[in-house]
Amino acid sequence: MVRAWKEKKVIPTYEIGKPEKNPIFLEKRVYQGSSGVVYPYPVIESISNEKVDKEYDAYFLENEYIKVMILPELGGRVQMAYDKIKQRHFIYYNQVIKPALVGLTGPWISGGIEFNWPQHHRPSTFMPVDVAIEENEDGSVTIWVSEMERMFHQKGMAGFTLRPGHAFLEIKGVLYNRTEVPQTFLWWANPAV
């Protein structure tokens, strides 16, 4: 049997500063394969030095073998994946949210599995995404996270499916070009192991 649910989760967090109030037009700042352009996303250039306990809406998937936690408020990343048989995490579980200013728009965190598109470490990697739980006819459950990306007006989704009797998490990426012109993109996931 597979269960999915939403639960409040308190995680020690170093909060981010306020976004720059004026847009930053970065051009020709080649940054790990991207142009560096992030407009219209706001850029954040500061992180607090003090840790606070912050409450997040965490979404969980669980069967007899594994338990997974997804944080839609932090870009829809898989924050935790736990092997219940071996009693250990099978991806790095960073139990403190401490951003570094290395992302295209500033904040980026290590750990879990991060999903990136249309370029680099997704400009919105530290921003909230939409979330939905889908119960499938075969007894599996899928948690979908999605967003309408602002730079190129594409829609990106990641579906996390857990099946009864299986000891793996199935991840499906879906991208939609919502424009009338062809768009280029990169798509990849960064699992921390």
Task: Tell me the role of every PLM-derived stretch.
Residues 101, 110, 137, 180-181:
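Intrinsically disordered, low-complexity regions enriched in Ser/Pro/Gly/Gln/His and often acidic
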Residues 2-38, 58-62, 66-128:
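Acidic-aromatic substrate-binding/catalytic surfaces of carbohydrate-active enzymes
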Residues 25-53, 58-62, 110-168:
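Extended, loop-rich substrate-binding clefts of extracytoplasmic carbohydrate-active enzymes
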Residues 48, 62, 68, 72-86, ...:
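Acidic, contiguous internal or C-terminal segments within carbohydrate-active enzymes
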Residues 1-32, 163-172, 176-193:
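An exposed, glycine/acidic-rich loop-and-rim segment of catalytic or binding clefts
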